[in-house]
Amino acid sequence: MSSSRMPALFLGHGSPMNVLEDNVYTRAWRQLGETLPRPKAIVVVSAHWFTRGTGVTAMEAPKTIHDFGGFPQALYDTHYPAPGSPELAQRLVDLLAPVPVALDKEAWGFDHGSWGVLIKMYPDADIPMVQLSIDSTKPAAWHMEMGRKLASLRDEGIMLIASGNVVHNLRTVRWHGENTPYPWATAFNDYVKDNLTWQGPAERHPLVNYLDHDGGSLSNPTPGHFLPLLYVLGAWDGQEVITIPVDGIEMGSLSMLSVQVG
């Protein structure tokens, strides 16, 4: 990575409780914020904004969205008042054309997939941010292509952060007691790591075709938490180093794998 090029990050965000906790994952996020070059702005792709069509937050002051239930009041009292950037939102509209991108000026904001990790990386909430939605109607290869289109922003001092979980099966989560990962969850998590640097046509990429893996559908009964990874891999130039800042599987079937490009 050149000295001026921003990295691209995929962060396994896990439970909202990570906002309140100090653990190996939150410490890794904090270290990223302390050691990586400070971005001029951030584009976030979160698993929690899954839409028909593509949208981008375009307000001056996006709200903090508490898109979860049954957690301690302290979580609902926590806000992340990072400024928005209507200018950057318009830049994405132009950059992603001919894909139509709707400018969202009031409906959304920063959900816990975005602010839940950024509050650890940049606790002062002073870096302008926009959040890009994930179009639920498009195939996996399309999302990787979106990452390729976003890659040029990295040379403008803008960091791309995608947030999800490459293993995300809440039906099999061990909510209490036993925390040992299921063998299929470990196998799929390893499969992801083994294929991060695969090169070739997007439609043939093993991670675009993740459902072909024996544990793919069990690890991801729905695609929303897996697809953010493809934006970051799409922004890879094929030569940059790809590293893993932190890894682990919590509650049996929730991968906390994070991936850094550059």
Predicted regions and their residues:
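Internal, conserved structured core segments that host functional sites
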Residues: 89-144, 149
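Flexible, glycine/proline-enriched loop segments at strand-loop-helix junctions
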Residues: 75-83, 105, 133-140, 216
